[in-house]
Amino acid sequence: PDHHHAYNALGYSLADRSLRLPEAHSLIKKALELAPGDPFITDSLGWVEYRLGNRDEALRLLRRAYAARPDTEIAAHLGEVLWTTGARDEARRIWREGRERDAGNEVLRETLTRLQVKL
């Protein structure tokens, strides 16, 4: 079936748990083929690239997703990749922007807690 949301949701849920990453990557790529330019799918692809250890590609994709749609969950993902590459000031700035938009976002809160970051 050509249901990009379903491919993306399944791929993202696998990637977020670091499960079956090659399968997650394939599912998300399929979703992006069906809905090119969708920032949420681009975010998912960036997230799976990060989980696969491809930080440069992850950063490129997550920056693109965030520029297209500055969503708090995308901010959480972009900030984490920035943080792990040493761009900590930029990560904090992105996270603060995300918090201003949605202070109660669970993904952002979990990310900051796991990385032990205080904003």
List each language-model region with its residue ranges.
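Structural signature of tandem alpha-helical TPR/SEL1-like repeats
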Residues: 17-30, 52-64, 86-94
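Conserved positions within tetratricopeptide repeat
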Residues: 7, 25, 59, 89-92, ...
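Structural marker of alpha-solenoid helical repeat scaffolds
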Residues: 34, 67-68, 101
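Specific register positions within alpha-helical solenoid repeats of the TPR/Sel1-like families, i.e.
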Residues: 15-16, 50, 83, 117
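TPR alpha-solenoid repeat register
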Residues: 6, 41, 74-75, 108
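Residue-level recognition of tetratricopeptide repeat
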Residues: 3, 12-13, 38, 47, 71-72, 80, 105, 114
